Amino acid sequence: MEEFQRYLELDRFRQHDFLYPLLFREYIYALAHDHGFNSYMLLENIGYDNKSSLLIVKRLITRMYQHNYLMISANDSNQNQFFGYNKNLHSQIISEGFAVIVEIPFSLRLISSFEGAEIVISYKLRSIHSIFPFLEDKLPHLNYTTDVRIPYPIHLEILIQTLRSRVKDASYLHLLRFFLHQYSNWNILIITTKSISIFSKSNPRFFLFLYNSHICQYESIFLFLGNQSSHLRLISSGVLFERLYLHKKIEHFAEVFANDFPVIPCFLKDPFMHYVRYQGKSILASKDTPLLMNKWKYYLVNLWQCHFYVWSHPGRIHINQLSKHSLDFWGYFSSVRLNPSVVRSQMLENSFLINNAPKKLDIIVPIIPLIGSLAKARFCNALGHPISKLTRADLSDFEILNRFLRICRNLSHYYSGSSKKKSMYRIKYILRLSCVKTLARKHKSTARAFLKKVGSEFVQEFFTEEEEFLSLIFPRTSFTLRRLYRGRVWYLDIIFINGLANHE
């Protein structure tokens, strides 16, 4: 980081809080386009084209101020989308530069917050699976959950105000506001789901930064409100998985927002409330009464409406009883069920049968939504019958087989924590036959004739690969391997949800 600061002359900019001059540094756009840090430092083999030159950036900013370049009417917005894929406008260049520069104050503040503190800096994202042991430990002892979808988007000026509290360069904020306001249909852009998808795909770094800024502001206020209740302090467990350079875990919000609030939230004292979030969906779990959960519901609605000026109806927040409803989260269906057991106890000549029914979190694969995702990706039809998938003609048989195996492996790893793994056999069966039909279609044959020609061992890896993977980790007896394969296995290297598993 010290070498990075020296290269970008960040110390000088940090002293004066100047970000605007960085817009006219060409290496900023090299940073935006290149993903290898060594190439930034050496300025060798820079991976951006001549369209990202400093001259073009200066012309773009000049034309922005002249009001004759970015004004787009509603009629030709489809042809001339400012935030779309039209490379002739070069709008993506500026948005990427904005994203790189505006992250600098956050990164520097993060590093300074670690100075003098005994906190281990980790730049690797925690695995998604790490949250499930936490849920297994806590949810069986709780009564109610609340599914909360964080409303977005918010008004453009609210985003600017959020950034203003952390970015002190008025010139930079003015240009950022001007840059966003130049799009005449901005309000339409940020309201429709389709437009949000287009914006996030064409400008992912910029979109994620704006979204994360909104989420950080919301969660800092929300956790602060939770701490203000005398007996309602929050136990928080979660990670900002979708962020790019906001490395801080949610457990350390106390340090990040210490300057914003006079009272530092305490997260690890009271077991009444638990908060978990991934992307725009969060869960509040509590052991208390529905009355308390209703209070929290209206706290959230008032927070969104009064502070962020986002309309949100209380009916969007659902309060469910854990014993009667399943929890749809992170591609799994989770429910709390009784696990009855009988224990025989003998004292002297008398024996007793003790009925015990502890609660257990049952985590299963949502087979119907998962088949729907496979059908949407053209691996099967709506009824789950495998079909051949269109592939490029120049792909070899090995490449086609390897692609199917990679998809099967990713799904198997992600759903390795399911308590009922037999349902995964159906998914593997669909992928296996889809692979066979795809290869048979390439060779202009039938699936039966193709299997007869190559042998059934050709696709056996779909069913044996998971056990072989476990055998590398646990080199023990076959009985132990079978027990491990039937049990739950949580992997610590899964940092995002597979696209097929994310069926929401």
Swiss-Prot record:
Transmembrane region(s): none
Known function: Usually encoded in the trnK tRNA gene intron. Probably assists in splicing its own and other chloroplast group II introns.
One of the GO biological process terms: tRNA processing
Effect of residue 340 to T: In haplotype A
PANTHER family: MATURASE K
Compartments it resides in: Plastid, Chloroplast
Family stated for the protein in its record: Belongs to the intron maturase 2 family. MatK subfamily.
Keywords assigned by UniProt, alphabetized: Chloroplast, mRNA processing, Plastid, RNA-binding, tRNA processing
Name of the protein: Maturase K
Any Pfam family matching the protein: MatK_N
Gene Ontology CC annotation, any one: chloroplast
Main localization category: plastid
GO MF assignments: RNA binding
